[in-house]
Amino acid sequence: MSSNSPTNLADRYAFLQAELARLEHAYYVLDNPLLPDIEYDRLYRELLDIEAAHPQWVTSESLSQRVGGTALKEFDSVTHAVPMLSLNNAFEDSELIAFDRRCREALHVEHVAYAGELKFDGLAISLRYENGTLVTAATRGDGASGEDVTANIKTIRAIPLKLTGKNIPEILEVRGEVFMYLKDFEKMNRQAAELGEKEFANPRNAAAGSLRQLDSKITAKRPLSFFAYGLGALEPQSWLPKTHEELLNAYVELGLPVCSERRVLHSVEEILAFYNEIGAKRDSLPYDIDGVVYKVNSFAEQAKLGFVSRAPRFALAHKYPAQEALTTVLGIDVQVGRTGAITPVARLAPVEVGGVTVTNATLHNEDEVKRKDVRIGDTVSVRRAGDVIPEVVSVIKERRPSDAKEFVMPSRCPVCDSHIERLADEAVARCSGGLFCGAQRKQALIHFAHRRALDIEGLGEKIVDQLVDQNLVRTPADLYRLGFTALANLERMGEKSADNLIQAINQSRNTTLARFIFALGIRHVGETTAKDLANHYQSMHALMDASVEELLTVKDVGPVVADSITSFMQEAHNREVIEQLLASGMQLSVEEKIISAAVFGKTFVLTGTFPTMTRDEAKDLLEKAGAKVAGSVSKKTDYVVAGTDAGSKLAKAEELGVPVIDEEEMLNLLK
């Protein structure tokens, strides 16, 4: 460089940006270093020196921005322009064969080409590029919206801040997976051990934990990587290639990292061969996977197949069998689930299963413990079912010690000391503590606030967790004693949100008796039974005092439901909570049915999206008119009400010859 004049310096700065981006792509994406590290570092320091002298030149695309910035207090929410759907899973070859058959039959073709690729065990991410520049990155979240992790994503050197190539779309949302290479994970854990810091259990946890750091400077120190494999929003649509494989090739041209372990497959035989080939070398791959994914290769055929529920019809995840290991049972405890289920859990000598240290494994229920004959002191085979939930598979009885102890199910709940009961025809024992039991409290509150129950908008799982953990709420009745200050002081709860939640709680006092009964969370009492009970008893106190014999006279209430209701009502603390709720100003109305002769006694099934109402609203209208709304289509179904994007229920109705009507025709029947 002959001069330090601003013009020449600006040219040099532009050259360094482009050159360093090229070198990073070669190093982190192509695994083909073009310069020694010392030379790269020299160029990078020169870039930093120029930016220090001319900070006005720095943009979000500068490689210096990968080091991380100011720590955040919380992540903002990002709504996905195109939902990030999950995939249906297959564990058996027969499920894969059925998937291929469904695709061929739906497309009316003899053969379908599939794009086969790996299912990475990391964290799904969406990257939004506008005119080639990375502007937003978000986690999958619930599929509809996720967390804004843009600052953290920019620290991952495998992800380009600026796309390369000539054919760059105006808007491109790249879907992919953030993960850690095994060698990078092991090196990071070794360094953590040397410093006396906590080690991560596995690469997936390390990747997820690193990406969700509020301080991006911490993320910048973590060896995260990325592979692109999917597409979200796109403008213009004319940019879209014809096939998934061509899309991935286009990604490579744009400078995005794409896994090379992929193949276009033309038959079930080729699919199974690909699955077995990857499975054979799974342990030697440089990263963790838990299966392979098949996607119909043609985008036109994908569009024809569409979606069902929260998953595409054109794709399937083929999981590998769970991995197993042997260890010793040190003890057997019981855990209380959110619905009161008592689950025996084996405490194990620590053992590595599928790269995870396992110290506990589920034994499911008392019958399973007896069937497998699991005893304290036994050597057992432990498996991570679905590579997630550890379970005891079998006992190695040849190694059983003479002092091995049998498991005895406790008679009292270890959390609240309520009686543990087990109905004769059920495998699961349950705590009878109901709302009084701390283990069940959070789920009871979430159910109480559900939109089909008391419909308390804004009272979600995260708020409930804080209310219970801070001992602000023990029962649903405590919700109606909450003050503005207590709510406003909760994490992620400002004054406006606190005010809105208090209003929602107050509004919930005016509800129906049926919703109130359903909200109590009595086992076996769903919405329909709650409505039948409300119509029969007309008041809460009448239901509370009902005997089993009286309950059996209610429509569709059998011995199991009657026993469940009386057991719930006989618990003194449950009655106390109900009385507190009633004393808080609850106004419980009994819905009057407006009988329609055209639908009375008829069975309806709802599917798809309706033009003027939700399916829940349609269900309420039909039930008030005396109809029954079922969840699946059968020969006993009288009508299927279908909206747009109707799924498999519509196909089933056509197969069985069940009449299909739209929303307008349903409303005409109700007149």
Curated annotation (Swiss-Prot):
It comes from the Bacteria. CDD domains: BRCT_DNA_ligase_like (cd17748), LIGANc (cd00114). Its cofactor is Mg(2+); Mn(2+). It catalyses: NAD(+) + (deoxyribonucleotide)n-3'-hydroxyl + 5'-phospho-(deoxyribonucleotide)m = (deoxyribonucleotide)n+m + AMP + beta-nicotinamide D-nucleotide. NAD(+) binds at D37, I38, E39, Y40, D41, S86, L87, E117, R140, E177, K295, K319. Its EC number is 6.5.1.2. PROSITE patterns: BRCT, DNA_LIGASE_N1, DNA_LIGASE_N2. Keywords: DNA damage, DNA repair, DNA replication, Ligase, Magnesium, Manganese, Metal-binding, NAD, Zinc. One of its GO terms (cellular component) is cytosol. Zn(2+) binds at C413, C416, C431, C437. SUPFAM superfamilies: BRCT domain (SSF52113), DNA ligase/mRNA capping enzyme, catalytic domain (SSF56091), Nucleic acid-binding proteins (SSF50249), RuvA domain 2-like (SSF47781). DNA ligase that catalyzes the formation of phosphodiester linkages between 5'-phosphoryl and 3'-hydroxyl groups in double-stranded DNA using NAD as a coenzyme and as the energy source for the reaction. It is essential for DNA replication and repair of damaged DNA. PANTHER family: CHROMOSOME TRANSMISSION FIDELITY FACTOR 18, DNA LIGASE. HAMAP family: DNA_ligase_A. Belongs to the NAD-dependent DNA ligase family. LigA subfamily. This is DNA ligase. It comes from Polynucleobacter asymbioticus (strain DSM 18221 / CIP 109841 / QLW-P1DMWA-1) (Polynucleobacter necessarius subsp. asymbioticus). The gene is ligA.
